[in-house]
Amino acid sequence: MALRKSVTLGTLKEVQQAVPREMAYTKGIKNSIEKKVKEAQKHLLENFEKHPVTIEIASGPQGTNVSGTLGGIGNLFSYIGVSAGDKPLGPIRIMLKQYDIRMHHSKKKTTINITVPTATEIFRVTPLPWATGRSWAKGIETGISGLGTYLNIDSSRSRSGTGIQTKGKQRAGRFKNRTYLSSLLKNYYKEIRKIEKTTIS
């Protein structure tokens, strides 16, 4: 037989008073954690914007190969095959600004879980226009073939308007891989893990 427990008005009042305090406590913690996450995010975005690859692609089809990936020939915007007027960096910026903070309370402490985009998720929003399933952002780090047949000229056949792939070989040489998003994100994740390890008693 189940025992019934009566709730006195005094007990009910204590519970009602405790709920707002608990909500205020949780909100205060979340605001503090969010401030730290935004600071780490700010550093990530600053490093992303000043990276030579970002600068070069942001310069569009008339940019120069400041990243050194093409041996000074043409630019990444036209080499990747981005259509004139497109903003290939936009989806990356949107993803880098995303985060989710969740907290789990116990009697002794509050555990923090922070979710931010992975490199794999970002690679999915940076497709190579001419190679289904491949990412240009990942290709910066692993290599993008075609430098030998790349011709940096104004052409109506070009997506960007300033670069085409020819049938015959134009030069020797190969794409020079560069560290990019994976490296930037690795440092970002270290900062996020430090914030997560913060336990609040």
Regions found by a protein language model. Name each.
Residues 1-201:
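Short, Lys/Arg-rich flexible segments
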